[in-house]
Amino acid sequence: MKHHTVKHRFGHIVVVRCICLIFSIAASSIALANPYKITVLATNISDYGGLGEWSFSALFEAEKESVLFDTGFKSDTVLHNVLHLGVDLSKVEKVVLSHFHSDHTGGLLVLRDYFVEANPKALSTVYVAKGFFKQRVTAEGVEVGPGSFTSAITFKSEAEKRGINFIEIGSPTEIAPALWLTGPVPRKVEAYNGPKGLFIDVDGQATPDIIMDDQSLGYLTPKGWLMTSGCGHAGLINTGEVLQGIEDAPVVSIVGGFHLWRASNQVLSQTADWLENAGLELMMGGHCTGIAAAETIASQLGLPRSHISHAAIGSVITPDLKIIRSSVE
């Protein structure tokens, strides 16, 4: 699939303004051609009837094309929640797995099994970043894989038996109108953000795993980027800079897990500074972000109460980037 980046470099100020105006209109038209409603399907907090767990999943839903981002931890959590919410995934053909961890990959096979009868193509194209299928092991040599599997290859094989096709992303790629995957994120600011204790083989040597297959989804709206991460192991700042390398636009909203729940005050301050400079207006942290961490960032930025939420099952961000249902109203 083709992908592109756009940069404007013109010497004459009038030409710059004209070109930027034309591009702005074009970018808006692309985004508005398939505006997405974002619904949280798995995270730590739930209302009556939903299932909360340590995981993440969200649906980017639009008239022309929709994309499922991550699939939760336990095999049936997201299935339970979509049935509870009345969300139909049978028309959704594309799935993004943010990284190999089981709390983001656990529901894929059950969801495919459930919705395939209604649509043979349902949830059949799965995007993963390069390195997703590398085998992880503990220091004791115990294998750890995606979902409930110890073997990454077995997980892949079981998915392919169900008609799932994996596409490995190596660089920023547009997978649906105005939806961009970062692919593996260069670690320029944050080196690694996440748990330790797993290893991968690099040239015959057991090397600490820093989850280079961590990728995020960017939605290029008329206002700027909406960035969604499953865990943000690559670092929020690093990820945001990849999106701004695709198109130099503000990062107006962040959604999902950013693994800041154990972050130091220094890291939170650095993150808040970057987000403020990037133009953040709306924040819906969930999963591993941490409520206290999110509140700290929101306070430093001075975000109004209506612009920060802690995601719950059924939380929604509307196509015009407003929170209409959340755990914190």
Predicted features along the sequence, with ranges:
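Bacterial N-terminal signal peptides
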Residues: 15-29
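N-terminal secretory signal peptides that target proteins for export/translocation
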Residues: 1-15
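Active-site-proximal loop/helix segment associated with metal-binding centers of metalloenzymes
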Residues: 148-150, 173-222
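Pre-active-site segment of Zn-dependent metallo-hydrolases
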Residues: 51, 64-94, 117, 193, ...
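Cap/insert and terminal regions of metallo-dependent hydrolase folds
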Residues: 94, 101-107, 125, 207-314
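Conserved beta-strand hairpin/beta-sheet module of binuclear metal-dependent hydrolase folds
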Residues: 36-85, 210, 214-229
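Boundary at the C-terminal end of the N-terminal hydrophobic targeting segment
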Residues: 31-33
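Active-site metal-binding motif and surrounding structural segment of the metallo-beta-lactamase
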Residues: 76-128, 244-253
